[in-house]
Amino acid sequence: MSAASEKPVVTRFAPSPTGYLHIGGARTALFNWLFARGRKGTFLLRIEDTDRERSTPEATDAILRGLTWLGLDWDGEVVSQFARKDRHAEVAREMLARGAAYKCFSTQDEIEAFREAARAEGRSTLFRSPWREADPSTHPDAPYVIRMKAPRTGETVIADRVQGTVRFQNETLDDMVVLRSDGTPTYMLAVVVDDHDMGVTHVIRGDDHLNNAARQTMVYEAMGWEVPIWAHIPLIHGPDGKKLSKRHGALGVEEYQAMGYPAAGMRNYLTRLGWAHGDDEFFTSEQAMAWFDLEGIGRSPARLDFKKLENVCGQHIAVMDDAAAMHEIQAYLAAARKPALTDLQAGRLSAALYALKDRAKTFPELLEKARFALESRPIAADDAAAKALDAVSRGILRELTPILQTASWSKQELEAALTAFAGEKGMGFGKLAGPLRAALAGRTVTPSVFDMMLVIGRDETIARLEDAAAA
């Protein structure tokens, strides 16, 4: 067991603020969050904003919003990588002092000429700096970069908790630049310095970074620092097995909020996307924290499956606390740039949730089924509802209205009164329910007639029946 595995767990999510929070990045953040939270560890957030041309405050805000919506809370302040550039440069100079790095005065033109000659001669284009072993007394007064003095023989071995043992032949790795000629650090150095200084014990990230692990291990070893535990997770592919792209649908996390998926459902689905705990498909965040481990992560890319996502989200909506559901619905409306609920609508919707939550897989679907509670009179009938409100049906509704004016307003009493009325008319209750649904909701497929009547109340029920009867 490595020393890192014996320490309190510290994980991190380190996105670049060049766009929205990608769903793949969100899953990486989630895996780090679950691993830390399940072990009473620390989950840190670092914004890797060293690329000043592409990094934007708007992208940083979008990342923070996406993580917040998913419920992935981080510990401490958000760390800016750019703000730590002086520390990175300090480490580069320390590597120089240790003999683990050297000043390279080769110009870009010289490097390109070296590569062109290598290509022409069929040799490796891996740049071998002539300054690696040069005596400092021969150094010119000219701009230089600092390169790491990578070993040229042997191999660098990565013991990865997902990918297994991965070996890199050192002769295939060049002396990477750690500090540019303008004094700014490279990404490869900054990542290692930040992870070390932040006390990161486990680096859980996409397997597109696996090759970086070899170079970064060399930096750790050059500085005499403990190497963290690596876990490189496979990427997410589209349903067709190809790399996820816009043609597969939404890529940004905020798009999923705007489409009305519940955060708990997204967490559940993303956790299951590439990780397994037996045959369990539905689980709470508490269960996921307790169960999540690196050994359960598969090596093959996971495929995005929107049908599974909807099914899982539907299960979460069904068991959601009413207050939490109302909060998320309001947030969904804001994210989708739709009008907020009025106090009357919110009150009715809250009262109707018990009859709706197990009938919807997304919030738009739930709100569609809640139209009866949200719309104002007169209720517009769709084609099927208009057909159900023929002359005979309108007459029946007129006769029913006085009975409802005196009925006790409870589900049991309403059921008894309407069943008795249908019996007197020589019809089954189903024949009566059709016109009632059409009058109350303007639809023929609705929640229970009794649930709708209880939610909107006696006065609104009678008013809607009178509107329909008079049409």
Swiss-Prot record:
It comes from the Bacteria. Its EC number is 6.1.1.17. ATP binds at K246. It catalyses: tRNA(Glu) + L-glutamate + ATP = L-glutamyl-tRNA(Glu) + AMP + diphosphate. It is found in: Cytoplasm. A motif ('HIGH' region) lies at residues 15-25. GO terms for molecular function: ATP binding; glutamate-tRNA ligase activity; tRNA binding; zinc ion binding. Keywords: Aminoacyl-tRNA synthetase, ATP-binding, Cytoplasm, Ligase, Nucleotide-binding, Protein biosynthesis. The keyword Ribonucleoprotein does not apply. Signal peptide: none annotated. Its main location: cytoplasm. GO terms for cellular component: cytosol. A motif ('KMSKS' region) lies at residues 243-247. It is an enzyme of class 6 (ligase). InterPro entries: aa-tRNA-synth_I_cd-bd, aa-tRNA-synth_I_codon-bd_sub2, aa-tRNA-synth_I_CS, aa_tRNA-synth_I_cd-bd_sf, Glu-tRNA-ligase_bac/mito, Glu/Gln-tRNA-synth, Glu/Gln-tRNA-synth_Ib_cat-dom, GluQ/Sye. One of its GO terms (biological process) is glutamyl-tRNA aminoacylation. Belongs to the class-I aminoacyl-tRNA synthetase family. Glutamate--tRNA ligase type 1 subfamily. Catalyzes the attachment of glutamate to tRNA(Glu) in a two-step reaction: glutamate is first activated by ATP to form Glu-AMP and then transferred to the acceptor end of tRNA(Glu). Monomer. This is Glutamate--tRNA ligase 2. The gene is gltX2.
